[in-house]
């Protein structure tokens, strides 16, 4: 039911949602629900293990019946697939991933505590974003060469430790997962942005996106740079173009775009109207 309500809210009511005065609190509540319900309760944390197992099964002519053994996760995969067509990777990575939600909530706590933030320069940000594709390529190669070790290779994801076992594993695994959560408190969603192989796969799947769903104006990027500066994912170019492969659908830029008190082009247009009326 939650997924059924979330999809139309993001698809047809995103401007209303982004413009709501309590949107940050609403988003935090949704992320907390995803973490608790989809993650801890439903065990619906998607993993790179599934697509790797599909690759191995197709190579060996095996059955894909294992996909229906977990209906809850299959439903989340289906929602992510719909997201590919409508928004790109953003639906899953920004809203439906329990570990992503955990990192986002950890960041919110860090900001409340006023912890110092360490963000890479734009040059290093672009470089680091390529790492996740290298990790994905290595995992795919591993699945083809040694399919029996897929689960071992996939430990690069902290999902099993953090979500599936609630951090109750041998200390190296727990420390690894806690390290990524801790890093997200000083470097915004570092695992998601730079290392996550599932995120890389989602970005590739997002190439199926059928539309540019984020509204833009001619002044976006030239001269206005507000959305680019505010985008914590680094998904907006200096030209104002949205890099949908790095967009997590946080809707912050939609909020700015539609707000006459924040959007610089709207502010300037209002001032011109005032001068004409004077």
Please provide the spans of the model-predicted regions.
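Non-ligating segments of multi-cofactor redox enzymes
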Residues: 1-239, 245-246, 252-278
């Amino acid at each position: 039911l939650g997924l059924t309500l979330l999809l139309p809210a993001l698809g047809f009511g995103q401007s209303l949602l982004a413009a709501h005065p309590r949107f940050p609190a609403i988003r935090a509540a949704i992320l907390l629900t995803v973490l608790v319900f989809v993650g801890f309760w439903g065990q619906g944390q998607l993993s790179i293990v599934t697509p790797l197992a599909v690759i191995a099964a197709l190579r060996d002519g095996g059955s894909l019946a294992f996909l229906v053994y977990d209906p809850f996760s299959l439903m989340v995969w289906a929602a992510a697939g719909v997201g590919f067509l409508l928004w790109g990777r953003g639906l899953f990575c920004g809203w439906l991933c329990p570990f992503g939600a955990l990192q986002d909530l950890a960041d919110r706590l860090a900001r409340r505590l006023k912890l110092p933030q360490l963000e890479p320069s734009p040059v290093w940000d672009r470089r680091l974003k390529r790492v996740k594709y290298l990790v994905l390529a290595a995992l795919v190669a591993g699945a083809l060469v040694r399919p029996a070790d897929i689960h071992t290779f996939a430990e690069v994801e902290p999902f099993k430790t953090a979500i599936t076992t609630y951090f109750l594993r041998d200390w190296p695994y727990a420390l690894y997962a806690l390290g990524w959560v801790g890093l997200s408190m000083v470097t915004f969603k570092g695992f998601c942005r730079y290392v996550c192989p599932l995120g890389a796969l989602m970005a590739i799947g997002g190439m199926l996106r059928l539309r540019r769903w984020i509204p833009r104006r001619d002044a976006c990027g030239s001269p206005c740079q507000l959305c680019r500066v505010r985008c914590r994912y680094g998904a907006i170019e200096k030209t104002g173009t949205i890099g949908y492969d790095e967009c997590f659908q946080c809707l912050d830029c939609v909020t700015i775009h539609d707000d006459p008190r924040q959007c610089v082009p709207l502010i300037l247009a209002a001032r011109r109207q005032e001068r004409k009326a004077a």
